[in-house]
Amino acid sequence: MIKYAILSAYSDYQENIMEEFLATMSKEDSLNYELSRLYKQWGYKEYRMAKFEEYSFYSDNRDFLTAKGILAFNNSDGRLMALKPDITLSIVKNAKLSSALTKLYYNESVFRMSDSSMDYKEIKQTGVEVLGKVDDYLVAEVLSLAAKSLKTIDKDFVLSVSHMAFIPSLLAELGIGENVKKDIIRCVQGKNTHDLRAICEKSGVCSEKTELLAKLAGINGRFDEVLPQLTALACNGAMKKACDELAFIAASLRKSPLADRLYLDLSVLNNTEYYNGIIFQGYVEKAPSAVLSGGRYDKLAGKLRENTQAIGFAVYLDNLNLYYKKKREFDSDILILFGSSEGNESLLALVESFTDKGFSVRVEHTMPEGYKAKTVYAFENGALREVTAC
């Protein structure tokens, strides 16, 4: 009993120290740290990659990229290189594979053109990628990690889950052109069933298939609430198999405290040439757009690495500092003011005695403008004298 009490007290102490440590970081940096710890806890290994790839690699897979432009330059040997606009492509191409699953996480930057300024900018991302045999359990694990990642950002979050076997597979049966498919997909993503019906009618899609598309586009709610509706609408083998997969996910996550944050929403769609199976997007209260995106991409993985399946997601960290500004009460625990170095040889050892105990310390000649410390000392004649708390 005494041993348990000691361990419990030590655990609480460590937790308090960690909270104080994270409080000194920006939202972006603290998330990097916490998410890395989460992924390691689940057995994922950190993957580090080169900043550059040959331009032709990204150019050949341009359809997969969400970025409008690729930032390129000539290498010293004359090769055309690119600052990476995407991380998934690089991991699939370069990761070492084995008979076991390759479970990786990363903290990297990509370089993409801004939609607003049309200038290139650095975007920081973290995320996970799994290469190997993807089964229903692994899909549930990755979705659980995605939900936990969102909770780390904000307890008020939603993870919207969809499946490529429904609307994309139905569109493939209709015998319509690619431009019409794109128009219908835009309507589905915007939940615009009025225009969807008009496009289908103009394109000669029968009323039965049109209504099925409209009903599928309207599927949105918690898994247990809408999965029976979706199962009733399944009209081919691919849809029925997808319903079984979604039922497994629902059963696996039902006891999770995050289960009520997962929504089934078929308006979430992605590139049909690369993605298959489960796809998902994550939202938090203060951010105006998705901060997490992922899915299963066997088509892309198989294109780059034969007989390889894959699933993963990325968390976009670049704008979170804007939406989640931390209000730090103090800039440091201790501020020490001293006049000159002469006769103050013991000052450095004194500062180290504080930092060794976990305190944050700043040493200055004068009070920095706008700086706040829990305790302010003046260092005089080899000793500290408390001045004031500011």
Residue ranges and their predicted role:
Residues M1-K84, A140:
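TRNA-binding/sensing appendages of the translation machinery
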Residues M25-W42, E54, D86-L97, Y105-D154, ...:
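Positively charged, Gly/Ser-enriched RNA/tRNA-binding surfaces
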Residues E46-M49, L104-Y106, V158-S162, Y263-D265:
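A structural signal for short, well-ordered beta-strand segments and their strand-loop junctions
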Residues M49-A67, S162-A172, V268-G277, P368-K374:
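Beta-rich nucleic-acid/ligand-interaction surfaces
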Residues G69-N75, I176-R197, V284:
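Acidic, His- and aromatic-enriched active-site or binding-groove loops in soluble protein domains
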Residues A72-L83, R186-C187, G382-C390:
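Short, basic, helix/turn surface patches
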Residues V134, L138-V139, I153, S160-V161, ...:
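Cap/lid and interdomain-hinge subdomains that line or gate substrate/regulatory clefts
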Residues V142, H163-F166, V180, I184, ...:
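Internal, well-ordered alpha-helical segments in soluble enzyme and binding-protein domains
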